[in-house]
From Swiss-Prot:
GO BP term, example: telomere capping
The entry's keywords: Chromosome, Telomere
Domain remarks: The C-terminal wHLH region seems to mediate telomere-specific function.
Organism: Saccharomyces cerevisiae (strain ATCC 204508 / S288c) (Baker's yeast)
Purpose: Has a role in telomere length regulation and telomere end protection. Acts as an inhibitor of telomerase loading through its interaction with CDC13.
GO molecular function, one term: single-stranded telomeric DNA binding
Subcellular localization: Chromosome, Telomere
Subunit structure comment from the entry: Interacts with CDC13 and TEN1.
Winged helix-turn-helix (wHTH) 1 as annotated region, ranges: 311-397
Mutagenesis / variant outcome for changing W466R: Elongated telomeres and severe growth defects
Source species, domain of life: Eukaryota
Region feature Winged helix-turn-helix (wHTH) 2, mapped onto this chain: 396-494
Record's protein name: Protein STN1
Length: 494
């Protein structure tokens, strides 16, 4: 019965109470540690947004599980990627959390639906004793409150999850919490009557409308007064201008103003930004395959060159593909230099370097060609992709490159068949399994990059996107360092 006006909406036996009564819910008041899975949280945020719009006339923004109002929640997950953003004068970090509980069977399933976006102040992370460069790949306890408008988590505290046992215990508690939250919250009429009587006793000389919160009449609702009705026309203009300025610097900027849910366009950034010779795509720390149109544009502008070679990295990539196509296990330095395809790559790179020279110190084109060839070969040797059979005869062993590429193809094929979204490639494992003691993380990255490009081209209906991050848990010289592969599948395939 709603004789006290304490129910905002009722569906069968489930009552959605007015906000004033939320404090009597143990999950809202903080007496219970509310643990939630990432998949459940993302679903509940979408449902809660509809509940607040339909049942509370958009005068409330609250996370609900059934009719339980929830404030601070507790999750455990692995940080998959992060991004830095300045909002006003404060620097924030937006990271994505995954605990493998999101439903991948949804139509149009994307990585944004799989991962939970979390927002935290950079200064706060430092105050908790965490190293920002080591965040990616870590499993953390995350505490915070849900933001329905932006469908993200406002982080209040982070701490490390130190063991698998700790993570398993969290999962057990969360499963039990699930069952408890599935039981609707209810307050008896007797309790409601007592609360109503207490309200009258606290302010006996005040009228019913004045005694309560402006959002309620008695214990029920009263339409809140709009702030706009209290402002002048000039103040309204100033307010609109301020909103415009805030929107410009907001990371939630969206061209669709009809919907209050703004999606943050997320890019993954490697935490090791000083990694030499990796050239992780546009951002400098990440490898991606979304620059096809840019490559076509450069190819058109450089049509007079035999091969489009904008820099040493692209030239090295082209040389590596040429070596993979050779039907031989070894080749001499002189024979390699005489190959038509290699000459084309070297000539194009030398042309590029020739145009970049300082007028005061000019080298001949022939000398630049020889230097470019030596530099490209030395880079592959230093990465362990090709070996020197004999220093006197300068014969190159091509088996390391071929074996690693074959391993990369098989590894990516397995990940795709299992529909895995991430995969780890450890340097020490590759060195031992393939008997390549001189292979480096740089070399592994370059080979997997080319293999992923080829796979996406062969199976565009399956593999939608991919990117590579460095494994942040170890330094580059550490034998246990490696890379993280991220795969995003097409909606029809997933």
């Amino acid at each position: 019965m709603d004789k006290y006006g304490h129910i905002a909406h009722q569906e069968g036996d489930v009552c959605y109470y007015i906000p004033r009564l939320f404090k009597y819910n143990s999950y809202y008041s903080g007496t219970e540690d509310v643990r939630i899975f990432v998949g459940d949280l993302k679903y509940r945020m979408r449902v809660s947004l509809q509940i607040c719009e339909k049942y509370y006339d958009r005068r409330l923004s609250m996370l609900f599980w059934k009719n339980h109002p929830l404030q601070q929640i507790h999750l455990i997950g692995c940080i998959i990627g992060l991004q830095f953003k300045w909002i006003g004068k404060q620097e924030y970090i937006f990271f994505q959390l995954d605990d493998c509980t999101s439903d991948s069977s949804l139509v149009g399933y994307t990585s944004d639906m799989r991962f939970l976006t979390c927002k935290v102040k950079k200064d706060s992370i430092l105050s908790w004793g965490l190293n920002i460069t080591d965040l990616i790949g870590l499993t953390l306890h995350v505490y915070g409150q849900a933001s329905l408008n932006y469908q993200e988590l406002q982080v209040e505290y982070l701490r490390l999850c130190y063991s698998l046992t700790e993570e398993i215990d969290h999962w057990k508690i969360t499963m039990n919490m699930r069952e408890q939250l599935d039981t609707p919250w209810s307050l008896s009429d007797f309790v409601i009557g007592e609360l109503f009587t207490q309200e009258q006793e606290w302010t006996p000389e005040t009228s019913q409308i004045e005694v309560v919160n402006p959002d309620f009449v008695g214990i029920g609702y009263k339409t809140p007064e709009s702030k706009r009705n209290e402002t002048t026309f000039i103040e309204q203009l100033q307010e609109e201008r301020l909103k415009d300025e805030l929107e410009i610097i907001s990371p939630y900027n969206s061209t669709d103003t009809s919907n209050s849910v703004h999606s943050l366009s997320f890019r993954f950034v490697s935490s090791l930004k000083d990694f030499p010779e990796t050239h992780f795509l546009n951002s400098g720390d990440q490898i991606d395959n979304g620059n096809d149109e840019q490559l076509k544009k450069l190819e058109y502008q450089s049509a007079n060159l035999p091969v489009m070679i904008p820099n040493r990295t692209s030239a090295k990539s082209n040389l590596m593909l040429i070596l993979l196509g050779l039907q031989m296990k070894e080749i001499s330095n002189s024979d390699l230099y005489k190959l038509k395809e290699v000459r084309s790559v070297v000539t194009s790179l030398a042309s590029f370097l020739f145009q970049q020279q300082n007028v005061g110190v000019m080298k001949s084109f022939d000398s630049l060609e020889k230097e470019a060839f030596r530099d490209l070969v030395n880079r592959l040797v230093s990465q362990g992709l090709i070996g020197l059979k004999d220093k006197t005869s300068e014969t190159f062993d091509l088996l390391p490159l071929k074996n690693l590429f074959e391993y990369a193809e098989k590894r990516i094929s397995v990940l795709m068949k299992l529909q895995c979204y991430t995969g780890t490639v450890q340097l020490s494992h590759v060195q031992e399994k393939l008997h390549l003691p001189y292979i480096t993380t740089n070399g592994i990255v370059d080979v997997f990059k080319e293999c992923l490009k080829r796979t996406k081209k062969q199976y565009p209906e399956v593999l939608k996107n991919w990117w590579i991050d460095l494994d942040p848990k170890n330094g580059m010289e550490d034998q246990n360092s490696g890379i993280l592969l991220h795969l995003e599948y097409a909606a029809a395939y997933s």
